[in-house]
């Protein structure tokens, strides 16, 4: 810890800035910026920075590099801050909800990756529609997105990468690789010993009186959520096309979103559209981790594999999620409060 102020003695409520401390803090901060941190936090934008001193150069450097910068600005210095930053900033309320909204739902992928421990991959199994990855502690499932190119993809080569490296493929623009990355994430998070409840994700909002939107044509949805407005990439006569999410999600009472949106990278945008509404992320490919609660998800309805060998055979034979149930269980994880 570097002190940048000096006490003026007993009985004084003031302090003065220590030039040596400022210089050392600036040097340390510049060195840290070279490593491209996820977030730069500077205690405050004060009188020194307003005049071009203090940590002004480091703040400008971080912003010029495109790094997210968070600092406190007093009301009397707001105009000076806007001039200093050139207006390229967001003024936030000092509360957690505003901070998470500023942070952005697109960062949830990196957040999920930060929690993954490395380890060997025992097996990868695929069918035309599903992937199963068996890691050191659990199995993870993911649906392969429509349009994913599986031709000539060696599962052995992917398995040799290890769990953490394979999970990083969730950031890939290649749909098959992104699905592998999601399955690897789930092979870390969806562990048999996890403290979770039971239940089907479609039941989460069965009693909701307002508009309920389902992103994805879930099996059995007509019975479990008969009044839901269903949005699907390939809608039938009673469903809406994908573009309808733009006007159906804002202001809805609740939304059930398929976990497949993680692999096709549409989830962040859908969460932004549904901001302020109750949201459940549902499907066998749902990562069961509280990390997703901060991004607006209230309920995680996923799947835990209890019989890896049986599930691998089930996937290899091309079974649907209905057939998964004899080798694992549907579970829910709810945001506290």
Question: Where are the regions a protein language model picked out?
Answer:
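Active-site regions of enzymes building and remodeling cell-envelope glycoconjugates
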Residues: 86-92, 225-246, 277-278, 295-302
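Flexible phosphate-sensing "switch/lid" loops adjacent to ATP/NTP-binding sites
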Residues: 1-36, 48-55, 77-99
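Structural motif
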Residues: 39-41, 70, 213, 254-258, ...
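Conserved mixed alpha/beta catalytic, RNA-binding, or beta-rich assembly cores of soluble enzyme
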Residues: 1, 10-28, 37, 45, ...
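C-terminal functional extensions of proteins
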Residues: 84-101, 280-337
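Electropositive, gly/pro-rich neighborhoods at or near active sites that engage anionic ligands
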Residues: 100-219, 315-317, 330-337
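Short, conserved loop/helix-junction motifs that constitute active-site signature segments
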Residues: 60-65, 224-225, 247-250, 271-276
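Substrate-engagement module of ASCE P-loop NTPases
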Residues: 58-75
